[in-house]
């Protein structure tokens, strides 16, 4: 990827492939001996919208929503979802058309969150984790956030600064403030180690947001170069 155009086109605007013959996946399926690649295919085969990954439990106090990036193959989410899951969290995976702009998926996600909160008054916290382009989607939720339930957002390897193509095609503007009862964590890969970003003129992760909590990831993770996709697993281990 030699230019901003190819970066945006290849990462954000290529439609994913799916196999409709595969059944809907649940976190309980992660315990099987199925390969991570195959589990990832099933994850990305989920229908657009907010997908519950497990049965609801009486003790649940938090809804935890994962939002994939552009052209994701899903495999990068398998370990993190299993690691983050607890009895107090109800895990969801948000599938959205990442080959398009983010505005409509943001509105749909907010509507679905509102519906859950209206149905279950025991929920005390909303957590979202967005990777790459998905990080832009989850931060845009904060622009008009007016719900009383506290919200915690984690963005990983996400180009929150924007790119010329994203700005012009989707009228992207980064958030300028973090609302009350909300927390934003930024988990940034090292520019030169991230194959998605390293050929750009500047690091699109580097944005100044007052009150945001920023962590730069290390060089390696379990003996692997800590680049774009491994970043989710590192955050799952360190933040949860």
Regions found by a protein language model. Name each.
Residues 2-19:
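Classical Sec-dependent N-terminal signal peptides that target proteins to the secretory pathway
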Residues 64, 91-99, 103-195:
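Serine-dependent carboxylesterase/thioesterase catalytic core
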Residues 72, 135, 232:
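Alpha-helical and His/Cys-centered functional microenvironments
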Residues 81-84, 145-146, 170-173, 203-205:
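Glycine-rich, phosphate-binding/catalytic loops in enzymes
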Residues 17-124:
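Active-site catalytic motif of lipid deacylating hydrolases and related acyltransferases
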Residues 24, 172-240:
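C-terminal catalytic-base region of ester-bond hydrolases, centering on the histidine
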